[in-house]
From Swiss-Prot:
Organism per entry: Drosophila willistoni
Residues annotated as binding substrate: S138
SUBUNIT field: Homodimer.
Record: residues binding NAD(+): 9-32
Cellular component GO terms, alphabetical: cytosol
Source organism, top-level taxon: Eukaryota
GO biological process: acetaldehyde metabolic process; acetyl-CoA biosynthetic process from ethanol; alcohol catabolic process; behavioral response to ethanol; NADH metabolic process
EC number assigned by the record: 1.1.1.1
Outcome after substituting S138P: In strain: Manaus I
Record key words, sorted: NAD, Oxidoreductase
Entry protein name: Alcohol dehydrogenase
Reactions catalysed according to its record: a primary alcohol + NAD(+) = an aldehyde + NADH + H(+); a secondary alcohol + NAD(+) = a ketone + NADH + H(+)
Family: Belongs to the short-chain dehydrogenases/reductases (SDR) family.
GO function terms (MF aspect): alcohol dehydrogenase (NAD+) activity; aldehyde dehydrogenase (NAD+) activity; protein homodimerization activity
């Protein structure tokens, strides 16, 4: 999928990986990049506009833990202005197993809500045009880091939810896939806490392993969006993007 002249909504597009991804996206000659983020960063928005003045970059303050009704209201505003949106990127995430409810709210519930809200506009059963959802997960969604079980479980939920959305593409017209980074040099890794403090040095231990840069992540995120493979589970580790073949152990038969 060529991104030229596309309209993209990017949840958490100003964070470490998010900002580098936004930089890569505007280089693709989008029509509009709409960034929803909790923290305003006027300097970053100005930088994105300067990278490619042909792209309209818009910022809306947004906390992904806001109720579904509020998310829907915001999307109504965005769709009223843009008329169409082609891609939704769900990129919000925290890594702090001290904050159990917030971890689940940010990493999973918020993603479900933005997906649910945008279906009001995309669902072909309602006359919508369909669309593409890129959900940013984590390799811990395949194999948990046991010292952060809440974070790992929230990312496993992202993979499971996205697989279901992908299988509904023939019903809704909406395709979906996950991109799941390995250990990346961001503030997320430096600041997180383990569950019940079972490992006080978990951040340091992770950083002792090979990592990847936020730029490498960003470039591969955009590559995955351009590939637009419905149902793909992408592993993005050490700067390499590769598909994961999920093993089926049970079939509902539905």
């Amino acid at each position: 999928m060529a991104l030229t002249n596309k309209n993209i909504i990017f949840v958490a597009g100003l964070g470490g990986i998010g900002l580098d991804t936004s930089r890569e996206l505007v280089k693709r000659d989008l029509k509009n990049l709409v960034i929803l983020d909790r923290i305003d960063n006027p300097a970053a928005i100005a930088e994105l506009k300067a990278i490619n003045p042909k792209v309209t970059v818009t910022f809306y303050p947004y906390d992904v833990t806001t109720p579904l009704t509020e998310t829907t209201k915001l999307l109504k505003t965005i769709f009223a202005q843009l008329k169409t949106v082609d891609v939704l990127i769900n990129g919000a995430g925290i890594l702090d197993d001290h904050q159990i409810e917030r971890t689940i709210a940010v990493n999973f519930t918020g993603l479900v809500n933005t997906t649910t809200a945008i279906l009001d506009f995309w669902d072909k059963r309602k006359g919508g045009p369909g669309g593409v959802i890129c959900n940013i997960g984590s390799v811990t969604g395949f194999n948990a880091i046991y010292q952060v079980p809440v974070y790992s479980a929230s990312k496993a939920a992202v993979v499971s939810f996205t697989q279901s959305i992908a299988k509904l593409a023939n019903v809704t017209g909406v395709t979906a896939f996950t991109v799941n980074p390995g250990i990346t040099k961001t503030t997320l890794v430096h600041k997180f806490n383990s569950w019940l403090d079972v490992e006080t040095r978990v951040a340091e231990k992770l950083l002792e392993h090979p990592t990847q840069t936020t730029l490498a992540c960003a470039q591969n995120f955009v590559k995955a969006i351009e590939l637009n493979k419905n149902g793909a589970i992408w592993k993005l580790d050490l700067g390499t993007l590769e598909p994961i073949e999920w093993t089926k152990h049970w079939d509902s038969g539905i």
